[in-house]
């Protein structure tokens, strides 16, 4: 069982931006709920996106963000939140409503739910395909398993699941790509799957 220090999601009216900024600077994630639009206010570590923040953006399917240049939120990341995702992040805020701090430590044990293998786009690195070839599994680099997307090679998915997923098990676990190995416990996808069980 591993302890994971993860951000707490909170919702704020834009009139209380100072509270939201303090929450985010302490490591949390904020949902700013304006009358006409909603946006996320997220931490930045000297221009870099913290790992669990990046995974939250991937889980939501949002890629674009701006770094706030001036004012109290200067240096933080601002992400437009489409209407279709509002209910989703509000679920996260509701889940985290009982936490008084901006970060929470959770003891997480893998429940083998395979959420890390669902609804994720796995980019391959050249080392992954080299490892497959070295292990006599060069066919894993073929069209049945890999496709091109935006100039990158990625694992194929079938009905939202990784092509290598067998039930809740990885069919190539010992040879899985480096990005699969790096998937963090405590990501929003992981936490959501745990809450549903």
Locate the predicted segments by residue.
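Hydrophobic scaffolds flanking metal-cofactor catalytic centers in soluble metalloenzymes
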Residues: 1-197
